[in-house]
Amino acid sequence: MMFNVRNTTLTTQKEVREFVDFHLEGLDYELKLTQGSYPYATDTDTKVVKNIDKAIEEITGIKPKHSTAGGTSDARFMAPLGIKVIEFGVKNDTIHSVNERTTKKEVQDLYKVFKYLIKEWK
Protein backbone atom coordinates (compact mmCIF):
# COMPACT_ATOMS: atom_id res chain seq x y z
CA MET A 1 0.00 0.00 0.00
CA MET A 2 1.24 3.48 -0.78
CA PHE A 3 -0.06 6.76 0.58
CA ASN A 4 0.85 10.41 0.44
CA VAL A 5 0.99 12.73 3.45
CA ARG A 6 0.89 16.48 2.90
CA ASN A 7 2.71 17.54 6.00
CA THR A 8 3.35 21.06 7.25
CA THR A 9 6.32 22.70 8.90
CA LEU A 10 4.77 21.53 12.18
CA THR A 11 4.95 17.83 11.21
CA THR A 12 8.05 15.67 10.94
CA GLN A 13 8.62 12.33 9.26
CA LYS A 14 9.29 10.90 12.73
CA GLU A 15 5.83 12.04 13.89
CA VAL A 16 4.18 10.45 10.85
CA ARG A 17 5.96 7.17 11.65
CA GLU A 18 4.86 7.36 15.30
CA PHE A 19 1.26 8.06 14.24
CA VAL A 20 1.15 5.05 11.91
CA ASP A 21 2.91 2.79 14.42
CA PHE A 22 0.42 3.80 17.12
CA HIS A 23 -2.63 3.10 14.95
CA LEU A 24 -1.30 -0.18 13.59
CA GLU A 25 -0.02 -1.51 16.90
CA GLY A 26 -0.41 -5.28 17.10
CA LEU A 27 -0.48 -5.78 13.33
CA ASP A 28 2.29 -7.46 11.36
CA TYR A 29 3.46 -4.82 8.90
CA GLU A 30 6.56 -3.26 7.42
CA LEU A 31 6.71 0.50 6.98
CA LYS A 32 9.07 2.26 4.61
CA LEU A 33 8.87 6.06 4.65
CA THR A 34 10.42 8.26 2.00
CA GLN A 35 10.25 12.00 1.73
CA GLY A 36 10.64 13.58 -1.70
CA SER A 37 10.15 17.16 -0.60
CA TYR A 38 9.85 19.18 2.56
CA PRO A 39 7.27 21.71 3.70
CA TYR A 40 8.26 25.34 3.78
CA ALA A 41 6.94 28.64 5.07
CA THR A 42 8.52 31.89 3.95
CA ASP A 43 9.05 34.36 6.77
CA THR A 44 6.31 36.99 6.61
CA ASP A 45 8.89 39.66 7.44
CA THR A 46 10.65 39.26 4.07
CA LYS A 47 10.64 41.90 1.35
CA VAL A 48 8.69 39.78 -1.13
CA VAL A 49 5.90 39.06 1.37
CA LYS A 50 5.64 42.69 2.44
CA ASN A 51 5.57 43.86 -1.18
CA ILE A 52 2.92 41.40 -2.30
CA ASP A 53 0.80 42.20 0.76
CA LYS A 54 0.93 45.89 -0.13
CA ALA A 55 0.18 45.21 -3.80
CA ILE A 56 -2.78 42.95 -3.07
CA GLU A 57 -4.35 45.41 -0.67
CA GLU A 58 -3.79 48.44 -2.91
CA ILE A 59 -5.01 46.75 -6.09
CA THR A 60 -7.84 44.54 -4.84
CA GLY A 61 -8.81 46.16 -1.55
CA ILE A 62 -8.43 42.76 0.11
CA LYS A 63 -6.17 42.35 3.14
CA PRO A 64 -4.01 39.27 2.45
CA LYS A 65 -4.30 36.23 4.70
CA HIS A 66 -1.10 34.24 5.15
CA SER A 67 -1.86 30.55 5.16
CA THR A 68 -0.29 27.19 4.45
CA ALA A 69 -3.71 25.64 3.76
CA GLY A 70 -4.33 24.02 0.45
CA GLY A 71 -2.37 21.62 -1.64
CA THR A 72 1.20 21.28 -2.69
CA SER A 73 2.99 22.83 -5.64
CA ASP A 74 6.35 22.75 -7.33
CA ALA A 75 7.38 25.69 -5.14
CA ARG A 76 8.32 23.12 -2.50
CA PHE A 77 11.33 22.24 -4.65
CA MET A 78 12.54 25.86 -4.81
CA ALA A 79 12.38 26.69 -1.10
CA PRO A 80 15.34 24.41 -0.17
CA LEU A 81 17.45 26.40 -2.65
CA GLY A 82 16.99 29.50 -0.50
CA ILE A 83 14.36 31.07 -2.75
CA LYS A 84 11.78 33.07 -0.80
CA VAL A 85 8.69 31.32 -2.11
CA ILE A 86 5.22 32.83 -2.05
CA GLU A 87 2.17 31.61 -3.85
CA PHE A 88 -0.62 33.85 -4.96
CA GLY A 89 -3.34 33.49 -7.52
CA VAL A 90 -6.99 33.90 -8.28
CA LYS A 91 -9.67 32.67 -5.90
CA ASN A 92 -9.90 28.90 -5.90
CA ASP A 93 -13.51 28.30 -4.92
CA THR A 94 -14.03 26.22 -8.08
CA ILE A 95 -10.57 24.64 -8.22
CA HIS A 96 -10.41 21.05 -9.51
CA SER A 97 -14.16 20.95 -10.15
CA VAL A 98 -16.44 20.78 -13.14
CA ASN A 99 -16.48 24.24 -14.73
CA GLU A 100 -13.35 25.38 -12.91
CA ARG A 101 -13.23 29.09 -13.66
CA THR A 102 -12.32 32.59 -12.59
CA THR A 103 -13.36 36.07 -13.59
CA LYS A 104 -11.69 38.38 -16.08
CA LYS A 105 -11.26 40.95 -13.29
CA GLU A 106 -9.38 38.46 -11.10
CA VAL A 107 -6.96 37.69 -13.94
CA GLN A 108 -6.47 41.41 -14.58
CA ASP A 109 -5.88 42.05 -10.87
CA LEU A 110 -3.41 39.16 -10.76
CA TYR A 111 -1.51 40.76 -13.65
CA LYS A 112 -1.48 44.12 -11.84
CA VAL A 113 -0.18 42.58 -8.61
CA PHE A 114 2.67 40.79 -10.39
CA LYS A 115 3.49 43.93 -12.40
CA TYR A 116 3.60 45.91 -9.14
CA LEU A 117 5.96 43.34 -7.61
CA ILE A 118 8.34 43.54 -10.55
CA LYS A 119 8.36 47.35 -10.53
CA GLU A 120 8.97 47.51 -6.77
CA TRP A 121 11.75 44.92 -6.78
CA LYS A 122 14.88 46.92 -6.05
Regions found by a protein language model. Give the residues of each.
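Metal-dependent amide/peptide-bond hydrolase catalytic core
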Residues: 1-122
